[in-house]
Amino acid sequence: MNGILPLYKPTGMTSADAVYHARKILGIKKIGHSGTLDPNVDGVLPLAIGAGTKAVPQLMASGKVYTGEITLGFATTTEDLDGEVVDKTPLTQPFTADQLDAALTAWTGNITQIPPMFSAVKVNGRRLYEYARAGETVKRPERQATVSQFTRTDEPVFSATDGTQRFRFEVHVSKGTYIRTLAVDVGKTLGVAAVMSQLTRVKSGGFTLKQAVSIEQLKAHAAAGTLADVIQPIDIAFADLPQVDLTVEQFEAISHGRFLSLDQQTPRVRLHFAGVLKAIYRREDDQYRPDLMFLANEKNV
């Protein structure tokens, strides 16, 4: 079995746990995910199955869309609600909608982020969260990210009792963007402490939340023998590349790793034979050469 499974990961489950459950249900060991979701974040987690694992870099390179909530007035060690409160800046009056929108706009475009201490980024061979759990702080490398859209999606709610204000948002980002840090940065722009108080990934790898399948639904499909209904073909990860349908002779040629002369000009193409993705070829010196091979890929039934 080969393909891409858009899985719904609930809150409280790690991405590794989601992979474990999928392996157990499908009886397949070769399964990987295309971008970690923190335990307290729910949403779309595309899983690559079998030969589909070769498509993970392509899936990870795609942009992601999140919806969530930012709360102004306090900060935590983890930049979300899981951490300990380390700063309080009680609001005596609410920010206007225009002020909030301007702060979001300020973090739209090409931005620079410093990864949070509670993250999986490695520094000197150790994960940042390992330093954080040991009570250590290290210098973290800056990372570039792109925020193509960052908008408020509801009316802000102010609590005079708590000195907080919260509002929901939708954000479209490039891979590797830390939404927790984005929430904190919005607070800095407004001059107050802030946390990400809720987050859902609604699009990843080209898959939307509506397409995502829960663990329970996956079990039901496995029992009914209808897994082909939810496991998408590998080529969906390369849908932006031109498709070339191979002749028998051309398929024989790529089966032996040979180059092809094609009536194409794009940097990469996806090669199909008998309706199934068999290879990704890249253009070099007026010929197309092997990039990724999927010769054993067949239709899931």
UniProtKB/Swiss-Prot annotation:
- Reactions performed catalytically: uridine(55) in tRNA = pseudouridine(55) in tRNA
Read off the SUPFAM superfamilies from this record. Pseudouridine synthase (SSF55120)
Cross-referenced Pfam families, in alphabetical order? TruB_C_2, TruB_N
Q: Where is the active site?
A: D38 (nucleophile)
Q: Which InterPro entries match?
A: PsdUridine_synth_cat_dom_sf (IPR020103), PsdUridine_synth_N (IPR002501), tRNA_psdUridine_synth_TruB (IPR014780), TruB_C (IPR032819)
Give the record's family classification.
Belongs to the pseudouridine synthase TruB family. Type 1 subfamily.
Q: What is this protein called?
A: tRNA pseudouridine synthase B
Q: Which organism is it from?
A: Lacticaseibacillus paracasei (strain ATCC 334 / BCRC 17002 / CCUG 31169 / CIP 107868 / KCTC 3260 / NRRL B-441)
